[in-house]
Amino acid sequence: MKNIILNNKNKKEIQNYLRKVIEIGLDFKCQERFRTNILEKERYNELLEFPDEGKDILELLEYFKLSILPYCSNFSSINFMGFPDSGNSMSGMVGAILSDLLQQNLINSSFCSPIASFLEIAVIRWLRQLVGYHNNDTIKDIFQVGGIITNGGTGSNATVLLLARENHRSNTMNEGVKNPGEYKVIVPKGIGHYSIRSSLMWLGCGNNIIEVPINEFKYNLKELKRAIRKNKGSIMAVIIYVGDSRTMTIDNIEKICKIVKNEDDNIWIHADACHGFSLAFSSNLKHFIKGINNVDSISIDPHKVLMLPYTLSALLIKDAEKMKLISSNSDLIMQEPFAFGQITPFIGSKSWDSLKLWFLIKNIGIKEIGKIIDRRYNMALFLEKILNASEDFIVINNVKINSVMFMYIKNKKNIEYNIEELNYINKKIKEIIDKEGIYYLHQFSILDNIGKLKKNATIYPLRYMSGNDNIKREDIIKMVRYVRNIAKRVIKFYLEEKRK
């Protein structure tokens, strides 16, 4: 076991092992298929066996390559078209590897991460500048930074609801929630992300979500105003989706801010822009998120939209000093000016995840990232165009970022199937796609809020949403052809069987 701990004597040998690791990982990422094998239940016990004896690292790597890797999902495949989390940027991978090797802990700065803390501050300031938040010329301490890095959008949203709670009823952290009904949060009906409801319950505020009706996947503004007035004094936050996780619809940011602040200036307005913030890089598309600088906070997920390895999210706060509402005091977290541990709830030891984004932005540059976002948007528009031109597919949403929801309907001019049958057909299509493992498209239930098939009927569309910039138009065309061929099989076999 001479090589279990790195030292100067075995450094060369461990370098060879790590080269092998990188080779395995890169070969996997460059596979065309989304998945090679499906894990069978019979293997569960084997995977759960307790390892009494160790194995040689090369033997273990070979076992991993042959027996584990084929069952992994390849988000970097050009055929992975259901989510944008491709994780295949060169500079992002460099940052991820270095972050793990360097072992910096950003809970404190003076000895744990003397320079890492300041590079993380730089990344947060770049993000603030992109969305239009003001940055001070100089910063004296962590409470002037105006944001934190978290490990995902759920962590960012949970933290912001903690902030909203303290802003709504001061000193709740010390005194506790006395009346959960006074801590309500407004979301758009049917498209809210689960993290908001879950976070509200985790924070002891109960399931006090108010769902406001929507028009074309955006707030019905009259109903929003009515909900605020009906619950006057008990609304702690209103959530705006700047690209909801299903349709990528961008809500009316400026109008919502005006309505909310006119009704109650103390209500916290939070923009969940985990996807939509990417448009801030693009001079051509940033007008879609106009007014985002007016909200109290913004959650963003670079790991979703900037080709970064998991995980990296950020929470940006317009008024940086508000972070004092949720600060921690402990002699384990040194009370020094730039210790992030003072303002990162739910996180203790803190890895240098932001290094991935630091490398990516410094390597590619803001302008070039903007061109990548433009291309991604245009690729979604291309798919929308060919689906609209087809006779057998219908697009369910208005494309604004990179989500295209669509359903196979066989014949637009004469739709012979009812909603139940169309849902059955499209769920069977998805089932076969998943079983074959060549492509990945997402699927979920959603109300047909635009009325493409039947207004507010529950439907099960397929969803394309890619952040893999290796994808070309011909790949999109191949995917549509593949789905169409499966659909014809479904129509021929499964639907006939169902009607017996």
State where each predicted segment sits.
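Conserved small-domain helix->loop->beta segment predominantly found in fold-type I
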Residues: 41, 344-350, 354-375, 384-425, ...
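Conserved PLP-enzyme active-site core in the AAT-like
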Residues: 156-324
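Short loop-beta-helix segment that forms the pyridoxal 5′-phosphate
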Residues: 128-162, 210-212
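Active-site C-terminal subdomain of aminotransferase-like
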Residues: 290-391, 397
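Alpha-helical scaffolding segments of alpha/beta enzyme cores, especially the outer helices
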Residues: 226, 254-259, 382, 424, ...
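Buried hydrophobic packing segments
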Residues: 98, 120, 124-127, 156-164, ...
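N-terminal entrance/gating region of PLP-dependent enzymes' catalytic architecture
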Residues: 1-144, 431-450, 462-471, 478-483
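Short, glycine-/Ser/Thr-/acidic-enriched flexible segments
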Residues: 82, 190-192, 216, 243-245, ...
